[in-house]
Regions:
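Conserved catalytic core of the tyrosine transesterase superfamily
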Residues: 1-179
Length: 179
C-alpha cells in the first residue's frame, strides 16, 4: 500500500491553531504534540511522573513498537503544564469529568483547532508530529536525531520525512560553485 503522508503544517498555521484553541488543556496538548513529536496515544497516556521538569524531558514508556524513548520538553510547554494541575498525580490530561481522553476526542480537538485557525488541509494529530519532524529537518537537525526523537526503529521510516521537506533548493549551492 502507498504510505499515507499527513499534511505538513507551516509554522504560522501551527501558531494559529494554538492561538485559536481557547481551552487551555487542549491548547497545551497541541503545543506538546508539535513541540515533542508525541503521538496522540502517548498524549492521552502521559503521566505526571514521566515528566522531568529539571531536565526538560518526557519519558515515553511503552511507545509504539514497545520501546521507551525520551523526548524534549519545550520551555513554553513546561510553563503551560505547570498551570494545568497543582496535584500533579496520575494522568496529565483529563476530561472535565476527570476521565482519560479517547483517541477520537484528541482527533476532534486537533480538527476543531485547525478549522478555527482557518486551515483548509485535513489536519490530524499525526500532522503535528509530521510537522515537528519536517521543521526540525528544515532547521538542519540531523535525521538520526529526529529518528531517535520520533522513536523510529528504522532510519528508512524517518527518511519519509525528507521527501516532503520543502527546503529551498535554490539556496543549495553546487560544489562546483564553491571552488
Amino acid at each position: 500500500r502507498d504510505k499515507y503522508l499527513p499534511e505538513i503544517l507551516s509554522k504560522k498555521e501551527i501558531e494559529n491553531m494554538i492561538i485559536s484553541s481557547k481551552n487551555f488543556s487542549h491548547r497545551t496538548m497541541i503545543m506538546l504534540m508539535y513541540s515533542s513529536g508525541m503521538r496522540a496515544s502517548e498524549i492521552i497516556n502521559l503521566q505526571w511522573r514521566d515528566i522531568d521538569f529539571e531536565r526538560n524531558t518526557i519519558h515515553i514508556k511503552h511507545a509504539k513498537g514497545g520501546k521507551d524513548r525520551i523526548v524534549m520538553l519545550s520551555p513554553k510547554v513546561k510553563k503551560a503544564l505547570r498551570m494545568i494541575d497543582i496535584n500533579r498525580d496520575g494522568l496529565v490530561f483529563k476530561t472535565n469529568r476527570g476521565e482519560k481522553y479517547s483517541l477520537r476526542s484528541i482527533q476532534l480537538i486537533v480538527k476543531k483547532a485547525a478549522t478555527k485557525a482557518g486551515i483548509k488541509k485535513r489536519v490530524k494529530p499525526h500532522s503535528l508530529r509530521h510537522s515537528f519532524a519536517t521543521h526540525l529537518l528544515e532547521n538542519g537537525v540531523d535525521v538520526r536525531y529526529i529518528r531517535d526523537l520520533l522513536g523510529h526503529a528504522n532510519l528508512q521510516t524517518t527518511m519519509i520525512y525528507t521527501k516532503v521537506s520543502k527546503k529551498d533548493l535554490s539556496k543549495i549551492k553546487s560544489p562546483l560553485d564553491i571552488i
